[in-house]
Design a protein with these regions (language model features):
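A short beta-strand-loop-beta hairpin characteristic of the jelly-roll/cupin
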Residues: 69-93, 103
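Ligand-binding loop in jelly-roll beta-barrel domains
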Residues: 101-127
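Conserved short histidine dyad/triad with adjacent acidic residue
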Residues: 50-65
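A short, N-terminal "cap"/entry segment at the start of jelly-roll beta-barrel domains
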Residues: 2-48, 61, 98, 130-134
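Short strand-connecting beta-turns/loops that link adjacent beta-strands
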Residues: 45-46, 67, 86, 112-113
Length: 134
């Protein structure tokens, strides 16, 4: 599965290297018909913020961050969250999902509208270790 990382140029004029402290997710988010897309909008030496867009049927593959916590604030949509490689838990807008360092996480959009969530990761940089699909 391929994940897309939006470039700063595609974020409609938003840059993660400025002093901005309020962000409009409608201006930050980037979409793709092919893959889930993560668009970074904020980073310091200790914390990073990104907005994810997962279209209906798309998956954010199961993975780990061995040294970072990852907190998701669900702004729109519904789907399933993978707290372990073999477990699915439903989620919907308005919920917060917390994955501590070393815990499996991933998601699939099972609804009819885009899943949009903000991810806050700390500390950064965060490693990305995909769950093997033996």
């Amino acid at each position: 599965m391929h994940l897309e990382l939006a470039s700063c140029k595609s974020m409609k004029g938003v840059s993660i290297m400025n002093d901005q402290r309020i962000f409009d997710m409608e201006l930050v988010k980037v979409e793709s018909l092919e893959n889930a897309v993560r668009t970074p909008f904020y980073q310091t030496d200790s914390t990073g913020g990104s907005v994810w867009v997962i279209k209906p049927g798309q998956t954010l593959p199961k993975h780990y961050h061995h040294n970072s916590d990852d907190i998701w604030v669900i702004l729109q949509g519904k789907g399933v969250f993978y707290p372990t490689p073999d477990t699915e838990v439903t989620f919907t807008k308005g919920q917060v999902i917390v994955s501590k360092k070393g815990e499996c996480h991933g998601a699939k959009n099972t609804g009819t509208e885009d899943v949009i969530f903000v991810s806050i990761v700390a500390p950064v940089p965060a490693d990305y270790d995909p769950v093997s699909t033996n």
